[in-house]
Swiss-Prot record:
Keywords: PQQ biosynthesis, Transport
Organism domain of life: Bacteria
PANTHER family membership: COENZYME PQQ SYNTHESIS PROTEIN B, HYDROLASE C777.06C-RELATED-RELATED
Organism for this UniProt entry: Acinetobacter calcoaceticus
NCBIfam families: PQQ_syn_pqqB (TIGR02108)
Entry protein name: Coenzyme PQQ synthesis protein B
Gene that specifies this protein: pqqB
Similarity annotation: Belongs to the PqqB family.
InterPro entries: Metallo-B-lactamas, PQQ_synth_PqqB, RibonucZ/Hydroxyglut_hydro
SUPFAM superfamilies, sorted: Metallo-hydrolase/oxidoreductase
Pathway: Cofactor biosynthesis; pyrroloquinoline quinone biosynthesis
Pfam families tied to this protein: Lactamase_B_2
Amino acid sequence: MYIYVLGSAAGGGFPQWNCNCPNCHGVRTGTIQAKARTQSSIAVSENGTDWVLLNASPDIRQQLFEFKAAQPARKLRDTGIISVILMDSQLDHTTGLLTLREGCPMNVWCTEMVHQDLTNGFPVFNMLKHWNGGLQYHEINPKQAFKIDGFENLEFLPLIIKSAAPPYSPHRNNPHDGDNIALIIKDHKTQKQLFYAPGLGKIDDQIMQIMQSSDCVMIDGTLWTDDEMQQTGVGTKTGREMGHLYISGEGGSLSYLNKLSTPKKVLIHINNTNPILNENSSQFAELKANGVEVAYDGMQIEL
């Protein structure tokens, strides 16, 4: 299995266009050691030619330009992107579908809850209906494994996770199963497994077992502390109120990751305020000392 990180930041990217927090100001002026990042999305493949896109960020055009394997150039109009899987209906994970309209019809896999949001609150399925067949909806049934045509060896098993629907969704304060999923992606040829959960709000025993049995885990790294938005003065909500598990301290994701013998542990979907973006920070050093990597745009993993 080939994994390519198209984007590794949370909504707004890094630096965020209107933000002058220490991280954004620092990367913009070159006064901190940090990499600029686009909004989170990854691509997976079994052969390095045909790819499944996991989430479609607003930065998708630039991401696919940087990702050379996405354009095999076999004919006048071409792409290596075969299908899109949506983990949720967040704007930073779905607005890229509008940019992909020239490639319609496009197969899009998502849960019924996500499909409801994307036909009502943000009706992208309706908007693109007249673009050469539009978005072709394939329902993801939580807890039921599925395969995608063209990917003989990859199996996708969705898992319901605790998180939050987007602010525009009627499910925001009335959560439903299927608002957010994680994916277990199994390569039956190599017998390797990826656990991907960029919107993880809680880690329970089941998720710990799945992560322990995986060869690579790539999970939510939005915030270092639960009150980071408040402490930096850029917001009023905690990470948990937004559906994101913080990294540090008791109950943080790092305390769980440290219990795993999983070969590769990666944090993705990183907010612009998170100190781990500064590669000279003590927080970045702490992750490195514990064998946890910080995803960056263009990161490549082979399982």
